[in-house]
Amino acid sequence: MKIFSWVQRKLSGKKRVPTSDSSQEPSSPPLSKEVQGLPQDEETFLAIGTLGNNIFPKQEEEEEETDSSKDITPVNTDVTIGKKKSLSFLLKKMFVCTSGFKTPPPLLDLSRGDSLHNTRMEKMLRTILNKKIHPQRSNSIAKKYLESNHKIMDEARSSVDANKWVKTDSECEIF
């Protein structure tokens, strides 16, 4: 009940009337320097120590004046804005309607005949086609490396063969 009375006081903007006598004020411990600068009214503090709405009353009045000066028609609370639904709409849908909530639409468009298998096949075909159109150059580089490696090996073999002693020269006899 205290919560409802607190909310009602906040909405109406009235201050709380203390129920105890003013002569019997409880003695409070001395406040620190940080707390002394803040207003000591109970109404200005909310839970978690944030300041209430009584601190800036002039700004609220100015905002109300600017809002009232605009020619805006009042908005119906049952109107949906974007994906937000009003509470009354949700309650009606949940309790009154027998069908309840609709299931969310599937991710695949079944009207086109899509299925999970078809989308996977399309994805695989797309990747294969993409690889055929834009092949990686690693194959041609490897071929060039192997060709140059064979040339180097052939040159090395030929240089080794050139240094061999040919027996035909030694067979030649001088008389």
From Swiss-Prot:
Motif window: IGT motif: 44-50
Q: What protein is this chain from?
A: Protein LAZY 3
InterPro entries hit by this protein: LAZY
Which biological process annotations from GO are given for this protein? gravitropism; regulation of growth
Record note on disruption phenotype: No visible phenotype under normal growth conditions. Roots of plants lacking LAZY2, LAZY3 and LAZY4 exhibit a negative gravitropic response, and grow upward in the opposite direrction of root gravitropism.
Q: Describe its function.
A: Involved in the regulation of root gravitropism. Functions redundantly with LAZY2 and LAZY4 in the control of root gravitropism. Functions redundantly with LAZY1, LAZY2 and LAZY4 to control plant architecture by coupling gravity sensing to the formation of auxin gradients.
In its UniProt entry, the species of origin is given as Arabidopsis thaliana
Q: Does the keyword Flavoprotein apply?
A: no
The tissues in which it is expressed are:
Specifically expressed in roots. Expressed in root tips of young seedlings.
Gene name in the database record = LAZY3
Keywords in UniProt for this one?
Answer: Growth regulation
Q: Keyword check for Oxidoreductase, yes or no.
A: no
- Stretch list, region Disordered: 9-39
Describe the family membership recorded for this protein in Swiss-Prot or TrEMBL: Belongs to the LAZY family.
Instruction: Say which domain of life the source belongs to.
Output: Eukaryota
